[in-house]
Design a protein with these regions (language model features):
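Short, acidic, small-residue-rich periplasmic hinge/interaction motif at the N-terminus
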Residues: 30, 41-44, 74-80, 90-134, ...
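Short acidic/polar hinge/loop motifs at secondary-structure boundaries
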Residues: 63, 180-208
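N-terminal periplasmic accessory domains that precede
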Residues: 94-98, 141-144, 161-164, 176, ...
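Outer-membrane beta-barrel translocator/receptor signature
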Residues: 199-201, 212-283, 288-296, 304-307, ...
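Flexible loop and strand-edge segments within Gram-negative outer membrane beta-barrel domains
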Residues: 276, 282, 287, 308-367, ...
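Outer membrane beta-barrel strand-and-loop segments of large Gram-negative receptors
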Residues: 402-417, 459, 574-581, 586, ...
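C-terminal beta-signal and adjacent terminal beta-strands/loops
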Residues: 552, 609-611, 615, 657, ...
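Gram-negative outer-membrane beta-barrel transporters
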Residues: 605-609, 618, 626-715
Length: 798
């Protein structure tokens, strides 16, 4: 028996010795939620003590494994929760391991796939992180976006800053707020985005319509505001910021608190309060330009390994005064205001916000969920938005405190998306349904600018990106959108006949009155959008992006139906019921170099838009309320082209140089003349110093030079002056002179305890108190822009 046992043991040893332990286990380490590759992951084989790491492409290979043997493999990554996998192999095998980012938050998982991932692969995106955004706590989202090349803004006083991307704005830009496309009467040039900059963790700018998951009508681009990331671990943290400004003699406070648990439950509460009085130009007070703002947001959710759900709510409310001198109702007063070097009305500084003014409230509610289905992720979202806009004119008598414009916009949206990947192919596909209703309150006693309407939208998209090899990646996508509008509108008989609608659309009339008709247009728009592009990695430092985007945009309600006085900008606007969808073809090329000391990117583009809708001044019209400029919408074929350049150079580890240059030109190909309101050439140069050993001291000096816009259409017209019984030309076409501004910023960080720190920031905008006027400021006819402004920021992290 003893001899038998020895023989068996010997045979077993011989079998083991002869066993082929040369098998290989290979595969990828990928993110659970979106299949993105995780480079730098470590795999430890417990039985053999073998340790390997994934490559830049997330690929691993474990050699010298034995057949029919069980192994325990621990997979670790710096941004993920470690996980151990058990498996047995019988031959060379391929196995992918999935990890979950412990810094993932549901907000990014659902729509973007993972925290702060690229929204498109063939367009170079620009980003602003939370540290940069905090410098604009006293300002607006538009102020922050202005720091990016290719972005400028339409301004109207303090707090109304509307982004322009490569020359386009309003309905041609998509604004995404925490996964929700904003619906906030964005058609108005003086309707700023209703988003609190202090609620944003990161801003992403896509200067193209290539990110089709958000919409196909982003001819200018897409701005994506994302909330701060939430760590999936037991923690409680927050921040409170106090900010103040000398110009406007005001300030505010913003605070945010986040609680998270290791089981995936988390919640965040955030709020902001701002109060500013009249701002001042270099030499005088800009009367009635105060601001009063109250914002808050709440977020609560559950983020588990393969499913999650989140609820989000935000409230935005602002009162914004509009420069008193901009509302000059008489023809002679308008000419005098335009020709004067100073505003016609200059009063003592005050915090009171009188008329004219805007009061806007925007509420957003959203619930979304995701479920991981292996190689796919299913995402469902519902959101509701309520926008209330009141615009007040200077009225007398019993109507003094009654708004001249009272709009209520309700929007319901459902999104269903499916994301997945097959080896080197990633896809996104989804459908969208939206119902919107607009109510223009007739109790204002003034003819409604835009009518009541119900609007139905349906969208369907698919986007694919394929990695051909280590250097070449291609992206393509297509989207179809259908819109239906059911509108009820009153037209004066004279307007209905003057525009030829009585001949073109006689069937639209449902009721006739003595001096007006009630019509019921039912409009349909079918739009196709697409994108095709690629990026080519020349080497580790140089990348080339090429993208062509076909975008289609249905006319917005203002462009179709405007027929009255727009009180916020004191002008009559006239739309056209005959408008068709705009169709844009934008080709952009970007070369990017990222090195140790020198970074550079250049982005030329050309955008040809068929049936481009433009609004221009045509005359001054006398009404019972005074004389007002008349601006009419019309369609034409247009071309926009330009280039954006960014460069930075590190002289040493403490001193850096930064440069930006943006050029955009716009032309009306039908009339062979420049387009109105195109941003002038501008350039920014900055030198910055940072000493991490000296309380992280940062000092920067920025030079901003804006050239005069020398290409503009001639929209001047003559007006009759009854007092002198003469005609005089109104020059509203000439552009302001070039100007140069200096801005200084400094900050330091102090450790106040083991778990808290204090950051102190000081800034001076318009350091030399320069008097200037910006071509894109709607108040440039009546006043200079803001003078010197001292800014103080105190931030406590805890």
């Amino acid at each position: 028996m003893r001899t038998y046992a020895l023989v068996v043991l010997l045979l077993a040893q011989l079998t083991t010795a002869s066993q082929n332990c040369s098998l290989t286990l290979s595969g990828k380490v990928i993110d659970l939620h979106d299949g993105s590759l995780l480079s730098g992951a470590t795999l430890v084989v417990s039985e053999t003590e073998t340790i390997v790491q994934t490559s830049l492409d997330g690929v691993y290979s474990i050699p010298n494994l034995c057949p029919n043997t069980s192994y325990s493999i621990k997979v670790l990554h710096s941004s993920c929760t470690p996980k151990t996998f058990s498996l047995k192999i019988s031959g060379d095998s391929v196995r992918d391991f999935k990890l979950e980012h412990h810094l993932e938050e549901l907000n990014e998982i659902i729509l973007e796939g993972k925290a702060y991932e690229n929204k498109t692969t063939t367009v170079l995106e620009k980003n602003l992180n939370q540290e940069t955004l905090e410098q604009y706590s006293a300002g607006t989202l538009g102020d922050a976006l202005n720091s990016l090349s290719g972005v400028s803004s339409l301004n109207k006083g303090n707090g109304i800053v509307k982004p322009i991307i490569n020359g386009l704005h309003s309905s041609r830009i998509i604004m995404i707020n925490n996964g929700v496309r904003m619906q906030d009467q964005e058609w108005g040039k003086e309707h700023a985005p209703n988003i609190d900059v202090n609620s944003v963790g990161r801003l992403t700018l896509v200067k193209s319509a290539s990110a089709l998951q958000y919409g196909g009508d982003a001819m200018g681009g897409i701005i994506i505001a994302e909330g701060p990331k939430v760590a999936i671990k037991d923690s409680l943290y927050g921040k409170t910021m106090l900010f103040g400004a000398s110009n406007g003699r005001g300030g505010g406070i913003t605070s945010q608190l986040t609680k998270s648990f290791e089981n995936g439950i988390y919640g965040t509460a955030q709020g902001t309060f701002k109060r500013f009085g009249d701002v001042e130009a270099a030499d005088y007070v800009m009367s009635n330009t105060g601001l009063y703002e109250k914002d808050m947001s709440l977020r609560i959710g559950l983020n588990r390994f393969n499913y999650g759900i989140e609820g989000y709510y935000s409230y935005f409310n602002t009162d914004i005064g509009i420069l008193r001198s901009s509302h000059a109702h008489g023809a002679a007063d308008q000419i005098r205001a335009i020709e004067s070097d100073i505003p016609l009305t200059i009063r003592e500084f005050t915090y009171d916000i009188g008329y004219p003014k805007q009061n806007v409230t925007h509420q957003l509610s959203r619930i979304k969920a995701f479920k991981n289905l292996g190689d796919y992720t299913l995402e469902i979202q519902y959101d509701y938005q309520l926008n209330r806009r009141f615009e007040y004119d200077i009225r007398v008598g019993n109507d003094r405190d009654k708004p001249a414009l009272d709009l209520k916009l309700d929007t319901h949206t459902i999104l269903i998306d499916l994301n997945g990947s097959f080896e080197d192919l990633n896809f996104k596909s989804g459908i969208m349904g939206r119902f919107q209703t607009n109510f223009a309150n007739p109790e204002t006693g003034i003819r409604r600018l835009i009518p009541d309407y119900d609007k139905y939208d349906f969208g369907l998209y698919t986007v694919l990106d394929k990695k051909i090899n280590d250097k070449f990646e291609i992206e393509t996508g297509v989207r179809f959108d259908y819109s239906y509008m059911d509108v009820f509108k009153f037209y004066k008989n004279s307007i209905w006949e003057e525009r030829g609608y009585d001949i073109l659309f006689p069937d639209l009339v449902i009721e006739e009155f003595s001096n007006q008709v009630l019509v019921n247009p039912e409009l349909e728009f079918k739009n196709l959008s697409a994108t095709l592009g690629f990026n080519y990695k020349i080497d580790d430092n140089n990348t080339l992006f090429i993208n062509h985007a076909l975008s289609s945009r249905a006319p917005n309600p203002a462009e179709l139906f405007s027929d009255g006085l727009h009180h916020s900008i004191a002008r009559i606007e006239v739309g056209d019921l005959r408008f068709k969808s705009e169709v844009g073809n934008k080709t952009s090329l970007t070369y990017s170099h990222v090195g140790k000391t020198f970074n550079f990117s250049i982005n030329p583009f050309v955008n040809n838009i068929r049936d481009f809708i433009v609004i221009e001044p045509v005359e001054i019209r006398e009404t019972i309320r005074g004389n007002f400029q008349v601006w009419e919408y019309r369609q034409t074929d247009a071309q926009l082209l330009g280039v954006d350049i960014d460069a930075s150079f590190s002289i040493n580890e403490k001193i850096n140089l930064n440069h930006q240059l943006s050029i955009v030109k716009g032309y009306d190909n039908t009339l062979n003349e420049p387009l109105i309101n195109m941003p002038p050439v501008n350039t920014k140069n900055e030198i910055s110093y940072q000493n991490k050993k000296l309380q992280n001291l940062k000092i920067s000096l920025q030079s901003e030079y804006v050239f005069a816009q020398n290409e503009f259409p001639n929209n001047n017209f003559e007006v009759y002056l009854p007092i002198t019984e003469t005609y005089e030309e109104v020059d509203i076409s000439s552009t302001p002179d070039a100007y140069h501004l200096l801005n200084l910023n400094a900050s330091m960080d102090f450790k106040t305890s083991k778990k808290s720190s204090l950051s102190v920031g000081l800034g001076i905008n318009n350091l030399l108190n320069t008097s200037y006027r910006n071509y894109l400021n709607l108040l440039r006819f009546y006043s200079d822009d803001m003078g010197r402004n001292f800014l103080l920021n105190l931030k406590l992290n805890y």
